[in-house]
UniProtKB/Swiss-Prot annotation:
This is ATP synthase subunit delta. The gene is atpH. F-type ATPases have 2 components, F(1) - the catalytic core - and F(0) - the membrane proton channel. F(1) has five subunits: alpha(3), beta(3), gamma(1), delta(1), epsilon(1). F(0) has three main subunits: a(1), b(2) and c(10-14). The alpha and beta chains form an alternating ring which encloses part of the gamma chain. F(1) is attached to F(0) by a central stalk formed by the gamma and epsilon chains, while a peripheral stalk is formed by the delta and b chains. The lineage of its organism: Bacteria, Pseudomonadati, Pseudomonadota, Alphaproteobacteria, Hyphomicrobiales. Its main location: membrane. F(1)F(0) ATP synthase produces ATP from ADP in the presence of a proton or sodium gradient. F-type ATPases consist of two structural domains, F(1) containing the extramembraneous catalytic core and F(0) containing the membrane proton channel, linked together by a central stalk and a peripheral stalk. During catalysis, ATP synthesis in the catalytic domain of F(1) is coupled via a rotary mechanism of the central stalk subunits to proton translocation. This protein is part of the stalk that links CF(0) to CF(1). It either transmits conformational changes from CF(0) to CF(1) or is implicated in proton conduction. Belongs to the ATPase delta chain family. The keyword Metal-binding does not apply.
Amino acid sequence: MGSVAVEETIVTGMAGRYAQALFSLAKESGTIDQVASDLQRLREIYRESEDLQRFIGSPAFSSEIQVKVLNALLNKVEITGLAANFIKLVAFKRRLFGLPKMIDDFNHLRDVEYGIVRATVTSAAPLKDEQLETLKGVLAAQGGGKSVEIAAKVDPALIGGLIVQLGSRMVDGSLKTKLNAIRTRMKEVG
């Protein structure tokens, strides 16, 4: 597969600044995992609720209303401490529209801190646990010895082989792509 460069992108923009501030506080207080867990729970609620998505994305609500509604939601789902205070601050500052990106950036900073690289592996059929573990080892070696977390996807249209995405790099070893390349070459020839 050749050497795969793993990038440790620095978070940028408004969402990056908020995420960096939250991450620094979480690291200082030793609560990185708790904050990550709380943010993940909020993200799941956000994904499942179109009403919450509209509420967070709408400038029609005052910051006071957003803080009150989010405070009630956070209490109901038992998100407390640093994560809850952060979310309420974001609402107060009228930056809720950027919350999903802030969560992504926080998770990226956490991964960098813990030496975790995320990979997506797409195959034509589900991979066995042993295959995933072997792939983790290969990707860890390619990624400079970092721990690799794999998100496995299945796409029967690939016919066979794998597509591996590690950071911004992608290696497409699928049979579908190889057959398409052969088809293209045959059209060029004849």
